[in-house]
Amino acid sequence: FDPRFEEALLLLADGRAILAVGNEGAVYAEFAARGVEIVLCPSLSLMGQSRKLGHTVPDFLRSAGVVEGDRVGVVGWKSFEPEEWESSTPAIAAPAFLVDALREAVGSSNLVTDATRVLMDSTSGLRAVSGPDQLAAFEWAAARASACVERVTTSIRPGMTEHEAVAAMGYAGEPLSAHIMFASGPEVAIGLRSPTERTIELGDAVTTAVGFWGGLCARAGLLANGPEDLRAESEGYLERMAIPYWRAIATWYETMRIGVRGDEIQAAVEAALAGAFSPALNPGHLIHLDEWLDSPIRPESTETIASGMALQCDIIPDSTGPGWAANCEDTVAIADQALRRDLARIHPELWARISARRRFMEEQLGIVLADEVLPFSSAPARFSPFWLDPERALAYRS
């Protein structure tokens, strides 16, 4: 169950699971939620809707057994580092009206604390590692996302509008983890934006991304057949941007393994870039139903990669020249021998796809993977800098 249009509140205590929902969520929860008590709380509904039936938020908390003196942990959207917060009242990234009602119910602000890391911490969070069935769902999402992106990058032509280019992805209504992204021309640096009616031109920088629950794929490059189509401002793109970028992508994959520290991955990526540019954000992060869960990959991080993690290889350049763009983002999972055995036994078709992808990366791209690295994208690490020549991709020399 995921709330749509409204907030929802799941309360767990004394062996009970109680889900408070608004007017629209009440109908959806009956269909989508399992193993929980569903309670109507119309204050969670949109403005202007009826509040006549159901509970107020304080009434719901009382009926659920929240009383003065209770300690309550709240899982919000994210947690904060100690240096980010100066108040003695715990910082909680959840709707204020819910947090205020909880504090009133237990009689003290300090009895309501942030418990977000119980689920989302990059090493100890319950959602940081997944079992074989959840990983199988993520593999579907990642493979589907990469197929959508490939259809866009291989069918795009000068003269199309951005909307026409993105229509090639074949979106079929699946839940998204991020807005569908596409940008071209001088605004390509704003990779987060949605497609427009802009007409795409030969030599444009182009970028696109598609993400479903559990997997995202992104690619960026130039709308050209090769260097001969480049504008003056794009001179040197291949040597100074595309090749160092892909070298960092390949290094990320070859460094990834169980037990490697986050700062080791960060350092390896920065060394591979050799000063050409730096990662704008963490060069990789955990992914789940949400596109970014947390990241163990950052400077000075002693957190280690563990079996069961689903990760994005996500290196965003911190600077680009005019008309330049490079991106090659895909999803992988990390699995020890026992988890690999379970995946192969329970999901043999998935395992066959993973095995084929590993062979492709090693035999065609020259990237050597640890046994525990399982590519989920249909074209892992395949980076074609010139979109009008999709058959040509960067690889290590054999």
What are these regions (language model features)?
Residues 1-398:
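Active-site neighborhoods and metal-handling regions in enzymes and metal-associated proteins
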